[in-house]
A protein has these predicted regions:
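Di-metal (Zn2+ and/or Mg2+/Mn2+) metal-binding site signature of metallo-dependent hydrolases
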Residues: 1-11
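Loop/helix-junction capping segments adjacent to catalytic residues or to phosphate/diphosphate-binding pockets
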Residues: 5-6, 31-35, 66, 164
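Divalent metal-dependent hydrolysis catalytic cores, especially in the metallo-beta-lactamase
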Residues: 11-37, 52-64, 80-94, 117-127, ...
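Glycine-rich loop at the start of a catalytic domain that most often binds anionic cofactors/ligands
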Residues: 35-45
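Short helix-capping segments at alpha-helix termini
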Residues: 46-54, 149-151
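Histidine/acidic residue-rich metal-binding segments in metalloenzymes
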Residues: 67-86, 92-171
Length: 171
């Protein structure tokens, strides 16, 4: 999470000091939803690298209910976009534009699978009736297992898991 604005110079410097490359999260305000936006953000990151750094940002797109297969094809064709991030709407920082109906994105997942573009998932449900400690497991049961079954060749990264259930599932 490199963020943008006033935070970008310090976050890029910190990451570039420790790593040669990093997957860059697209949950800015507004979110990074297209390849041109990702490339513009990449340019800003590169401008903020410390002198002599060869840090390379690996860009991602933010999936929304408006994402089109053509957006995925463009991302797959870009040498700088490495995946697409799924945020359930309201699940985390700047996720208001996230996905409301995950199953409606199945055509997008199909295109991602065809073009070998990884799906990076912030995996939790946002239903206030579900205990916060059960939200990853419910996401796994309701969404992740069906996605894996429907798209067996789709590369998936289940990011920043926080529960033993999620760790067991990944293992």
């Amino acid at each position: 999470h490199l963020r943008d604005g006033d935070y970008l110079p310090s976050t890029v410097a910190d990451v570039a000091e420790r790593f040669g490359r990093a997957i860059v999260m697209p949950n800015l305000a507004p979110p990074v939803t297209t390849v041109p936006q990702a490339l513009a953000y990449r340019d800003q990151i590169l401008l903020n690298r410390p002198p002599g750094s060869d840090f390379q940002p690996l860009m991602t797109l933010y999936l929304t209910d408006q994402t089109r297969p053509s957006d995925i094809i463009a991302a797959a064709q870009s040498p700088h976009v490495y995946g697409c991030k799924l945020y359930p709407a309201g699940a985390t920082t700047n996720s208001d534009a996230g996905v409301g109906a995950i199953r409606a994105l199945y055509p997008i997942f199909e295109t991602m699978q065809q073009h070998q573009l990884p799906l990076l998932i912030h995996g939790e449900v946002t239903d206030p009736q579900i205990d916060i400690f059960d939200r990853e497991q419910v996401f796994i049961d309701q969404y992740l297992i069906p996605i894996i079954a429907t798209f067996p060749d789709l590369k998936i990264v289940f990011e920043h898991i926080t529960t033993e259930d999620a760790a067991r599932f990944v293992a």
